[in-house]
Amino acid sequence: MANKKIDHREEAVELLKQDAKRILQLIKVQMDNLTLPQCPAYEEVLDTQMYGLSREINFATRLGLIEPEEGKKLMSTLEKELSALHELSMSKK
């Protein structure tokens, strides 16, 4: 175990990416099965999840585990994926 070097930066980025993927999946399931994107419950879940991820990114940035630009890129990528998912959902209805 002493010989195993842990790269906390890579681990932090990977965990944040997993959380972003989880948010995308959660919203996809909600759009497919539960509510419309205009529904207040949908918007509340999305806002809460995005806020939580932004706080995680802020925390990791403050610890020096990720660069601020990397955090911004992660949020931007997730926002684009969610926007595409929203457009796809609206075109099906």
Curated annotation (Swiss-Prot):
It holds the Pfam family DUF1507. It comes from the Bacteria. InterPro entries: UPF0358, UPF0358_sf. NCBIfam families: PRK13666.1 (NF010187). Belongs to the UPF0358 family. This is UPF0358 protein LMHCC_1561. It comes from Listeria monocytogenes serotype 4a (strain HCC23).
